[in-house]
Amino acid sequence: MFGRSRSWVGGGHGKTSRNIHSLDHLKYLYHVLTKNTTVTEQNRNLLVETIRSITEILIWGDQNDSSVFDFFLEKNMFVFFLNILRQKSGRYVCVQLLQTLNILFENISHETSLYYLLSNNYVNSIIVHKFDFSDEEIMAYYISFLKTLSLKLNNHTVHFFYNEHTNDFALYTEAIKFFNHPESMVRIAVRTITLNVYKVSLDNQAMLHYIRDKTAVPYFSNLVWFIGSHVIELDDCVQTDEEHRNRGKLSDLVAEHLDHLHYLNDILIINCEFLNDVLTDHLLNRLFLPLYVYSLENQDKGGERPKISLPVSLYLLSQVFLIIHHAPLVNSLAEVILNGDLSEMYAKTEQDIQRSSAKPSIRCFIKPTETLERSLEMNKHKGKRRVQKRPNYKNVGEEEDEEKGPTEDAQEDAEKAKGTEGGSKGIKTSGESEEIEMVIMERSKLSELAASTSVQEQNTTDEEKSAAATCSESTQWSRPFLDMVYHALDSPDDDYHALFVLCLLYAMSHNKGMDPEKLERIQLPVPNAAEKTTYNHPLAERLIRIMNNAAQPDGKIRLATLELSCLLLKQQVLMSAGCIMKDVHLACLEGAREESVHLVRHFYKGEDIFLDMFEDEYRSMTMKPMNVEYLMMDASILLPPTGTPLTGIDFVKRLPCGDVEKTRRAIRVFFMLRSLSLQLRGEPETQLPLTREEDLIKTDDVLDLNNSDLIACTVITKDGGMVQRFLAVDIYQMSLVEPDVSRLGWGVVKFAGLLQDMQVTGVEDDSRALNITIHKPASSPHSKPFPILQATFIFSDHIRCIIAKQRLAKGRIQARRMKMQRIAALLDLPIQPTTEVLGFGLGSSTSTQHLPFRFYDQGRRGSSDPTVQRSVFASVDKVPGFAVAQCINQHSSPSLSSQSPPSASGSPSGSGSTSHCDSGGTSSSSTPSTAQSPADAPMSPELPKPHLPDQLVIVNETEADSKPSKNVARSAAVETASLSPSLVPARQPTISLLCEDTADTLSVESLTLVPPVDPHSLRSLTGMPPLSTPAAACTEPVGEEAACAEPVGTAED
């Protein structure tokens, strides 16, 4: 519609020798216009092409030759444009002329050229010309023309549009007549035009007075009625769309309401004081209070007043507080919601409202007595009969205008007489003066009320505020709206109303224009507020109740509601000095967290992809925290909560469907409540995520590969590249390395990927090749994983290919298994030790030597340190988990050649009570008394004996001897000899466990490392000679490294 026509030519009309961009050609075109002053079917195409050519020459002259505009102005060529319009020449000519004028004004850059075009008032004559606006194309080009002109407004050009002598501003008044046009693009253009006009009016008092006195009240009253009509239509759509069939229409209505609010906020941001006063008064008393706020109460009470449903009212009020930050407006609105009383409103009869509806300060949602177009024409033609109406589309309620006829004319005459008698200075009518006075009076009343309220609140203590918030019914104020807010949070069936209430509380507390005292008066959460010692107990209890309901197996609480509850609770009780929550509430919260743990246990290993869901949900929760602004833009939450994904509603905004979604929901609830519990207790998160980036091998890391199991291969990437690499498999990762030229036996990592995200397939026609694909974890459960490696690996022979495939495939299984065991530790489930290390089975007699986890110190030293000997691939059975402390025999060498390094992909964290350790290279003994934990007292001998593996037999402590047992070392050597040389496991330490004598099995707590305890509680292996002293109970080193067992206590001191 807005594109240029194909027939745009610069036209010499057959005379190709003439330069089309020249003054001479403009003179020729002027001669053409003078010969064709009357539009006919024969010459209309010629006239259109001529006008286009003139426009092109004017744009060229603006940049290159000012004499073009001198000639244009001298010959008064704009008159020809206007005469062509006035001849009723038809749709084609009107469209082409409007299009041409729009292009002309868009491309003029010099103000002098613009002055030429705007002089003589011809542009205003085109603006007020009576086009046929029933034609969509004419309407589109006309409103685009007005928008282009409004963008040219400044302190100088505005005088060409606003005439102070005739008190007329055609650009503005003609534009606002389309404020309620059915086409959304037209309405958006009108908003842009009005905003441009308001910005310029700040520096032009005469124009500001005109806008204020002649247009503000009619425009804003009609605009408010238009917005309210959309709101009622939106509410009807929600009430009749229980089956989610009209979501498209509902989304459009919500988007329209958001556009209205942003437009109103843009007007308020301009900060034109009187315009803001009039607009605030109309919004409060004609829309927000009578339609939005009063709909919160007495939903079942009938009446003639328009009313919307409770969810829609809460939803729209949340949008108001999220978007509009004008302090007088939001504070007055919040005052009514938090402390308002309906007695004054309902004491008024319908007759009183109708009789005083012309006054802006009366709170009623009522249709304006006149349409905007009629009000503007009456203001323009005071003392004259009403002029003929301009052909236009139907305004809201215009069909009733013709029915009023003589009665309305009589009312107009009476109004004119009243204005003539009571008008001051001949500018303002008495009605307008009264409206202005009402606005000022209302503002003064609000300020006096706020002042008196603040005086009453000055000496109120925190305890009194808490009591007032807890027992609102005992106060002197009746707070029906606030009571309704709390009551909506109590619904045990679902969270349909609760979600909107939480959004409203969040929006009010985060509104920049909100007075904090209003929120603190009832102890609502205020971000960045001063330190306090009390909080809103009723609200906190309701939030905790929501969390407890969410942790139930059949809970109807959506994830969005739960996350918002956690957010508001933290905002209430978490201060910079710590948590101020009472113990009873904290205990209830811990109970909800325990319920969430039990809920996840029900789904543990219930799905094959539980691990993937667990990590995806944690990633989604941390990467995409809730944005309440975006949540309130979604129309789908207006409909009752549904449990089917067929509606297309986001998972966090609906109920789960099926076991997979129930598992996802249970995991997310567990994460939220765990995170909230840790933050309120001031404890750091040490066990999540399961994989931390800082603990993984990264590209360009330099690793010690001495005695590591490496397989040479050729990597052919998808784009055809071919490189020589060595394949190495770690606990969690596979890596491609190349030798480091600076140090022998060291390698530089060129690629590292997680084993759990890897797929390995053979190549049909080549037994030496494997296709390996590693995907990057998806940002959301619904997005497709992105492959970070997709290549073919070619090995030297099929044997190495089989070994690599087996190592990768079984390494992937083992990596996933270890993470599942870490999840079990998170859920306080008993851990069953794995019988495989990287997929290779071990004898049953040695299965307990390879405990499932080992938590290493997470400090990574730089590769430039020459003392670092990182052999991350040498011992494939060193896995992260519950630590087994290692020490050195006191008879061995006083120093070791190297430390036992932490796994490069070791556990990202240990439990809160776990002590991380590495083998001390210079320590020769461990004295129990120097590191004894006060919580580790010797266990009572009356406790039942535990059930231990065969090789861990309890003997009397006094029979221990300082000589090491060589039988144990010999047994370990025999067991490892059956493995491939590259898979020889590192020597495991002798295990000493502090346990209860009556325990039947090992518990998770018994495998958690704590400092040493009393020597009488140490247990040693069968067959070892008696030790002379408890401190000397160490085994003989089997290889270069030796390990000494530290006792293991419980995790819970």
Swiss-Prot record:
Assembly, per entry: Interacts with RNF41/NRDP1.
Keyword Membrane: yes
Tissue occurrence: Almost exclusively expressed in immune cells, including dendritic cells, B-lymphocytes and natural killer cells.
Start-end of Basic residues biased regions: 381-392
Entry protein name: Protein CLEC16A
Superkingdom field: Eukaryota
Gene: CLEC16A
UniProt record similarity statement: Belongs to the CLEC16A/gop-1 family.
Function, as annotated: Regulator of mitophagy through the upstream regulation of the RNF41/NRDP1-PRKN pathway. Mitophagy is a selective form of autophagy necessary for mitochondrial quality control. The RNF41/NRDP1-PRKN pathway regulates autophagosome-lysosome fusion during late mitophagy. May protect RNF41/NRDP1 from proteasomal degradation, RNF41/NRDP1 which regulates proteasomal degradation of PRKN. Plays a key role in beta cells functions by regulating mitophagy/autophagy and mitochondrial health.
Bilayer topology: Peripheral membrane protein
Gene Ontology cellular-component terms listed: cytosol; endosome membrane; Golgi apparatus; lysosomal membrane; vesicle
Disease link: Type 1 diabetes mellitus: A multifactorial disorder of glucose homeostasis that is characterized by susceptibility to ketoacidosis in the absence of insulin therapy. Clinical features are polydipsia, polyphagia and polyuria which result from hyperglycemia-induced osmotic diuresis and secondary thirst. These derangements result in long-term complications that affect the eyes, kidneys, nerves, and blood vessels.
